[in-house]
């Protein structure tokens, strides 16, 4: 029964899509990883994606609840965001999504 109840609990994904000034992606990535390291309660993982050959990227951060993200926006997190803000060409587009499907790799594929 607990597996069914876990299925009913939805995770949330915070998605930011943006572009950094030329040559600033690596610096932004380092600050992103620093910001992520401050997260605790409700944090379920994160990805930073980069369009090859560009300074465009997508950050995806997974949370148990939307409120968990708000709870994790502490002073250290805010200071890191301030350091990062000047690296963007323009402010990123941000949205919350409800995770509607999650498909882990099969055991056979994971062993290959």
Residue ranges of predicted features:
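Short S/T/G/P-rich N-terminal loop/turn motif that feeds into the first structured element of a domain
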Residues: 1-57, 62-75, 79, 86-112
């Amino acid at each position: 029964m607990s597996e069914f109840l876990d299925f009913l609990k939805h995770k949330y994904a915070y998605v930011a899509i943006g572009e950094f000034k030329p040559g600033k992606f690596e610096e932004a990535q380092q600050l992103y990883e620093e910001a992520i390291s401050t997260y605790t309660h409700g944090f379920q993982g994160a990805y930073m994606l980069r369009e090859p050959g560009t300074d465009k990227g997508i950050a995806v951060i997974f949370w148990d609840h939307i409120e968990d993200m708000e709870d994790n926006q502490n002073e250290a997190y805010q200071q890191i965001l301030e350091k990062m803000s000047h690296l963007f060409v323009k402010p990123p587009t941000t949205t919350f999504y409800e995770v509607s499907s999650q498909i882990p790799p099969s055991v056979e594929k994971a062993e290959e």
